[in-house]
Amino acid sequence: MDAFPSVELSGEAASTLAEQRWPTTLEEYNRLVALVRPLVPPELPVRAGGSFGPMVGTARGKFGPITNWPSWEVVLREDAVELLKAEGVTGVIAVRMELKSRRSNMPALYELEARPLAKLHPDCIGEWKTPPCDICGRPETFSLPPKRWLLRSSIPEGLDVFGVEGANLHVVSERFVEVVQRLGPADVTYQELPAA
């Protein structure tokens, strides 16, 4: 699922999507995409199931400096966002979440947006590809292969945080990890992602 908390929908697009009932026809879907597209940066995909704007909901418990919940969302505590920015970590797009909590001392939490700028290497996708859609002709997609590596030429230079096209991966640099780990233990594990 694509999540772009920094993209705030407004006007007709916001009110139309709030009233929308799913499933819908392909024609209606294309009309909705046309409404949203001008509000979304050109490098970001607009696909069914995507979410825009800050996450809204309820928070419970204590949060470490970085949390992965649900599995496709990365949440940062406010002190982690401040430290990452102070240390000059690049590519951090952190959007404050609109959360309610019973705890009066709940720190502000931020959703980390990872724009899909890199690509997995075609050799690791191989058998995991699906054919293009017969209806809309959209390019093939793939299930995330168990062994994966990035296409070196697609890795954005100078960014410590980015996403992977077609996958819900947040890629962070060693520098990002070192900075966040200074704030104490977290429930996130990191795995090296090679490139070829």
Language-model features and meaning:
Residues M1-A196:
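Phosphate/anion-contacting hairpin/loop surfaces
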